[in-house]
């Protein structure tokens, strides 16, 4: 039995481990990696730098938007507080005005009722005076009528002339 311990380390062709540094791809790999590192470092560095700048710009824009939103929020809150204060003033003014209108309306109603009562009293007084005058007039007419009926029988010629003279004197004094 012939055992070959190094069948994988063939000198010609195939797969094997070559320990000669000049013959190996190690130098080629180092050169390729060095060239890639040299050229890609600038390209990747620029790409990463652009990405970093874009991220910083986006972050700066976001911070600016946050500041603008905060300013707008503060302004809106101030406007809201002012609007609420104005609404409270309008409500208070409205309540005051409504109360004033109610009081004025009540006062005018009371005044109108008092005026109606005074008018009714005045009308009643005027009606009483008119009725009283009418009753006096009717009473006077009835008295005159009765006197006219009874007077000719009760008056003689001297009493009649005396009555006429006295009536003339009364008319002259009046």
UniProtKB/Swiss-Prot annotation:
Recorded GO CC terms: organellar chromatophore thylakoid membrane; plastid; proton-transporting ATP synthase complex
Membrane topology reported for the UniProt record: Single-pass membrane protein
GO biological process, one term: proton motive force-driven ATP synthesis
Claim: Zinc is one of the keywords in the record: no
The entry's keywords: ATP synthesis, CF(0), Hydrogen ion transport, Ion transport, Membrane, Organellar chromatophore, Plastid, Thylakoid, Transmembrane, Transmembrane helix, Transport
Single GO MF annotation: proton transmembrane transporter activity
Description of how the protein assembles with itself and partners: F-type ATPases have 2 components, F(1) - the catalytic core - and F(0) - the membrane proton channel. F(1) has five subunits: alpha(3), beta(3), gamma(1), delta(1), epsilon(1). F(0) has four main subunits: a(1), b(1), b'(1) and c(10-14). The alpha and beta chains form an alternating ring which encloses part of the gamma chain. F(1) is attached to F(0) by a central stalk formed by the gamma and epsilon chains, while a peripheral stalk is formed by the delta, b and b' chains.
Descriptive protein name: ATP synthase subunit b, organellar chromatophore
């Amino acid at each position: 039995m012939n055992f070959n311990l190094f069948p994988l380390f063939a000198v010609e062709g195939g797969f094997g481990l070559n320990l000669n540094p000049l013959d190996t791809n190690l130098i080629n790999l180092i050169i390729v990696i060095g060239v890639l590192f040299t050229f890609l470092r600038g390209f990747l560095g620029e790409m990463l730098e652009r990405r970093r700048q874009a991220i910083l710009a986006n972050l700066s824009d976001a911070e600016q938007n946050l500041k603008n939103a905060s300013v707008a929020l503060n302004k809106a809150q101030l406007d809201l507080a002012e609007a609420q204060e104005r609404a409270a003033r309008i409500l208070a003014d409205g309540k005051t005005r409504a109360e004033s209108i109610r009081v004025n309306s009540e006062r005018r109603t009371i005044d109108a009722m008092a005026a109606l009562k005074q008018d009714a009293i005045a009308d009643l007084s005027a009606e009483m005076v008119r009725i009283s005058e009418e009753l006096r007039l009717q009473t006077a007419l009835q008295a005159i009528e009765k006197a006219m009926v009874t007077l000719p029988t009760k008056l003689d010629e001297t009493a009649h002339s005396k009555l006429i003279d006295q009536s003339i004197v009364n008319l002259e004094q009046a």
